Amino acid sequence: MSDVLQKMETRRSIRKFKADMVPQDIIDKIIEAGLYAASGHGEQNTIMIQVTNKELRDKISQINCKIGGWKKGFDPFYGAPAMIIVLAKKSWPNRVYDGSLVMGNLMLAAHELGIGSCWIHRAKEEFEMDWGKELLKSLGIEEEYEGI
């Protein structure tokens, strides 16, 4: 079995994380793998946002928890110290498919590099909220993007 197929077979969603920050060079490699994802017509309309700031990470978690309807204090990111948010241009009809391929690459690369990962939903709802739109604006992202 090839290394790639073996990694696909053994990758699992992780729902308990260490508090230790993932080294930046590892995060960079994971993000780079996301850039290699296939996309409709080769458009590459997805963007990735790395979140390692604990205060911002906790705020995103609180909003995600509220959207998900969980009890206050539940962390839908399971204590992960870092996250990579994937967004795609709202105007692109293949946005969900393209963003999903990016997510798959990110999770597979994380596994290859010894880092646990888990796809967490509700980014679409978070970035439709005024708070999410303001966050994107503060990061210099002016176009309309949808969370994947």
Predicted regions and their residues:
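Acidic, surface-exposed loops and disordered segments
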Residues: 1-148
